[in-house]
Each structure stands twice: as C-alpha cells, then as structure tokens.
Amino acid sequence: MPIKKILLLNGPNLNLLGTREPHIYGYDTLASIESSLSTYLSSLTPSVELLTFQSNWEGALIDRIHEARTDGTDAIVINPAAFTHYSVALRDALTGVDIPFVEVHISNVHKREEFRHKSFLSDKAEAVICGLGVFGYRAAVEWCVGYLKERPKL
C-alpha cells in the first residue's frame, strides 16, 4: 500500500507556542505538538506520513503549498494564524493546488477580537476546527486519515 502524506503547515508566531500567551495557546511547544501528532498518526495507521513546515513568512508558506502539488501530499492541515484574516494569496495557493485542507486554530477565534472572526480560508476548507486547543490538530489529522481512506488518490 502506498504511503499517503499529510502536510502540517503552521503560520506566523506559532514557533513561539509554549511561551507566547500561554493563557490563550497553552504550554505545548510546536516541536512537542509535531512529535505528538507523528506518534499519534503512527498509532492510527502505518500508511500515512506527517510532513511539517512552519514559517512566519507568507511567501514561504505559499511556496510550500505549491511544492505539495508535486511531492505527493494528499491532504493539508493548516493553522494559518494571523494570515487567516487577510491572506488572499494563501487562499489562492490552497485552492490552486487542489489538495483537500483542514483549517485549525488553537483558540476559539470567534470569542476573541472582532478582526479574528473573518477567515479567508474557511469557505474553501473541507473542515474548520477552532477552540479545541492543541487537540484540534489531532482531530484534523484523524479527519484526514479517514478522508484518505474513503477517497484514495487517483
């Protein structure tokens, strides 16, 4: 059985997880989240690999999304962070590669400042998860595994 790939993308300031506003985002670091997700994914299925990428630069995230089109990525889990609220370029990149994606936010963006309520990605995402803390990443990965089993890549 061929290996499927899920790409986990994290946007600006998420490299500061564990120390940045822990009352909102918790104390888990991005490295610990990635490691935990990888372990969890291995327990679900040996046939899916987790790829990870984080950048504070919009263009770097867009380049990585474009790369996903040719590197065998089957699904994307993305926490676009602040880019959620204004990045048409990120939206266009995600829709342009035709890879299903899940939008994740650690906090409940709808309980926060008004400017955080608008997402340029949500209407294009297969699913949107917010407010579950870092568990939201696990839920997104699990959804992707189920989706990939139901809809194999042609």
From Swiss-Prot:
Record key words, sorted: Lyase, Quinate metabolism
Cross-referenced InterPro entries: DHquinase_II (IPR001874), DHquinase_II_CS (IPR018509), DHquinase_II_sf (IPR036441)
Site (Transition state stabilizer): 20
Catalytic activity: 3-dehydroquinate = 3-dehydroshikimate + H2O
Residues involved in substrate binding: 79, 85, 92, 106-107, 116
A single MF term (Gene Ontology): 3-dehydroquinate dehydratase activity
Protein EC: 4.2.1.10
Active site, UniProt feature: 25 (proton acceptor), 105 (proton donor)
Name of the top EC class for this enzyme: lyase
Record pathway: Aromatic compound metabolism; 3,4-dihydroxybenzoate biosynthesis; 3,4-dihydroxybenzoate from 3-dehydroquinate: step 1/2
GO biological process: 3,4-dihydroxybenzoate biosynthetic process; quinate catabolic process
Function comment: Is involved in the catabolism of quinate. Allows the utilization of quinate as carbon source via the beta-ketoadipate pathway.
Protein family membership: Belongs to the type-II 3-dehydroquinase family.
Subunit text: Homododecamer. Adopts a ring-like structure, composed of an arrangement of two hexameric rings stacked on top of one another.
HAMAP family: AroQ (MF_00169)
UniProt name for this protein: Catabolic 3-dehydroquinase
Underlying gene: qutE
